[in-house]
Design a protein with these regions (language model features):
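Short acidic, S/G/P-rich loop/turn micro-motifs used as interaction or catalytic elements
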Residues: 49, 81, 207-208, 454, ...
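P-loop NTPase switch/coupling surface
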Residues: 1-220, 458
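Activity-critical C-terminal alpha-helical subdomain
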Residues: 507-566
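Switch/connector loops and helix/strand junctions flanking conserved nucleotide-binding motifs
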Residues: 82-86, 151-152, 209-211, 374-377, ...
Length: 566
């Protein structure tokens, strides 16, 4: 996977920037204001992997021509047993470089311009090493410049020369010369670019065009191209039989016309080639087909769907192919720009649930978004917050399992302000999704619980009604967060109580240090605690502020032991 990327003079980014993307998770979000550079990151990977044109930052023309060059340098984290042995020596050099890199590694004093990417990279690697045992992984910071030559960004400095011990003529000003970088790392670079497949789905994509079977993106999702599919269905023997029959017909005409014959130019007569047959089949069979969605009245072409339905269809198609068709997605990285675009607020949560499931079937899923409601609900994921201050970009990477604690810590320590979006919008967007989805004609029902283990158990016991009752089970990270969500729902309830059709149930454990708060008697919103009765051996649901506060009870204390052991 890609855990981060160095960007220099690419689209929104001037100078050198390091953007951390993951500390081990395959579900990676990018948040920030419009125009701040979220989609630039996804575009850069399209240029790197797929050869799309580079969108060069205009500041490059003003920079020093002696050192300025645009580059894209992803930082890969790859299991050692997944990289061919012949690349291990080079990968070991780069892993040493990444792990040992510190403020002295560049070899020159850091300036206000060069310090931020260096510090961000160092802090990111420290965080990664806390989260992941890197014993079985290579960390490979390796990319290319505009001309396609291998590039190591700011990591090309004193530490690199110490590690690989180059000859004197390979070094200039304490750095490896471009020719030396190419000599040492170009072959590994080409392998990485070919090994991984990258699909970029921009916000303004035409869903009708994107979902056609002949597009490269759909074929990447399927894990095979149309030529391979046709070859499997129409083997060479059939094409040979067609040629034999057609040549027999031409020979018959030649006999009938005596001194005339239908021939191709030259002495060698051309037969129908395999590629000719494939192209005919693609044109006459596949190209005329469009994606249709089945509903109660029949089939509807994607062009006739609403904007929100089109956006949903793209994610549904990706998930369907990855889950049911492609053999595995180990080499596939997907970048999606604003997957919530055009969706009603009530549909955002389900869209991001689909995204999360999709991330489990590919190597990595990176997305940009303005909807923060997924932050409290995802246990295994990362989100990078991007802010700009005085034309300089700042990046903060959060692990979603504990992002609230990280925010509190950074708020106390950071010189820069933590963006309010992260602190407020994550909960507010989730509340809006819950309320709006309960107002629909076919409403959702919600079960809010403390953590991911509760969700795991509850999903098993309630599996029969998850689909039939449109039940969504959401872990929010502890009793305090359950309380916060209840109080926000309670405040909003009066405005919508006549129209609410769905139900919201908030469930907490009974902890030793009980978190008690008053709970109003609201018909469609209930807030309860689980508690065991040691006398009757029955688990009860009591109000949060009930006087029954012992024994302390967690969901594990209430499970059916036979089901649990199975």
């Amino acid at each position: 996977m890609i855990i981060g990327v160095f960007l220099r003079y690419f689209k929104t980014y001037s100078g050198t920037n390091y953007i951390p993307l993951s500390s081990g998770s395959s579900f990676c979000g990018l948040v920030g204001n419009n125009g701040i550079g979220k989609s630039s990151i996804l575009e850069s990977f399209d240029s790197f992997f797929n050869g799309k044109s580079w969108n060069i930052n205009t500041g490059l023309k003003k920079a020093s021509t002696s050192i300025a060059t645009s580059h894209i340098v992803p930082v890969f984290m790859i299991k050692k047993n997944e990289l061919p042995e012949k690349y291990h020596e080079t990968a070991n050099y780069l892993t040493q470089l990444a792990i040992q890199f510190d403020e002295r590694s560049v070899g020159t004093p850091l300036t206000p311009t060069t310090r931020p990417p260096v510090i961000t990279f160092i802090e990111h690697l420290r965080k990664l090493m806390r989260n992941v045992d890197l014993t079985d992984f290579f960390i490979i910071p390796l990319g290319c410049d505009y001309d396609g030559y291998a590039n190591l960004s700011i990591l090309n400095g004193k530490l690199l020369t110490d590690i690989i011990s180059p000859s004197d003529d390979e070094v200039e000003n304490g750095r490896l010369k471009t020719t030396a970088v190419i000599g040492h790392f170009q072959i590994l670079l080409e392998y990485l670019k070919c090994h991984y497949e990258y699909i970029y789905i921009p916000k303004d994509i035409d869903p009708e065009t994107f979902t056609k079977l002949e597009t490269s993106e759909i074929q990447k999702l399927m894990g095979e191209n149309l030529e391979q599919i046709i070859q499997e269905k129409i083997p060479n023997e059939i094409i040979s039989t067609i040629n034999t029959g057609l040549n027999s017909f031409i020979s018959q005409l030649e006999r009938e016309l005596q001194i005339y014959s239908y021939r191709t130019s030259g002495d060698r007569q051309q037969n129908l080639k395999r590629r000719d047959v494939y192209n005919l089949i693609i044109d006459a069979f596949f190209r005329i087909r469009k994606l249709n969605k089945k509903d109660s009245t029949g089939w509807t072409e994607i062009s006739s769907l609403s904007s929100g339905e089109k956006q949903r269809a793209i994610i549904d198609i990706a998930q369907g192919f990855l889950t049911n068709h492609r053999e595995n997605g180990d080499k596939l990285i997907i970048g999606i720009d604003e997957p919530e675009c055009s969706l009603h607020m009530s549909a955002c949560f389900e869209q991001f649930e689909n995204l999360y499931r999709t991330s489990k079937n590919c190597r990595q899923l990176i997305f940009t978004t303005h909807w923060y409601g997924y932050l409290p609900t995802v246990e295994d994921g990362c989100t990078t917050s991007i802010i700009r201050n005085n034309s300089a970009h700042h990046f903060d990477l959060y692990d979603l399992a504990g992002y609230r604690e990280e925010i509190k810590k950074k708020t106390k320590e950071a010189k820069e302000k933590i963006p309010y979006d992260i602190r407020l919008k994550s909960t507010n967007d989730l509340i809006q999704s819950i309320i709006s989805s309960t107002l629909a004609e076919e409403p959702y029902n919600w079960l809010i619980c403390e953590g991911s283990t509760e969700k795991l158990y509850l999903s098993h016991y309630l599996k029969d009604i998850i689909e039939s009752k449109k039940l969504r089970i959401v872990p929010v990270g502890g009793a305090k967060e359950v309380k916060k969500i209840f109080q926000l729902l309670e405040v909003s309830h009066d405005d919508f109580k006549k129209d609410i059709k769905g139900k919201v149930y908030l469930l907490s454990d009974t902890d030793r240090e009980i978190l008690s708060y008053p709970v109003s008697n609201i018909e469609k919103i209930k807030c309860k605690r689980i508690i065991n009765d040691p006398q009757t051996l029955v688990t009860s649901l009591v109000d949060i502020d009930s006087v029954k506060v012992s024994p302390s009870t967690e969901i594990e204390n209430c499970l059916n032991g036979f089901i649990f052991s199975e």
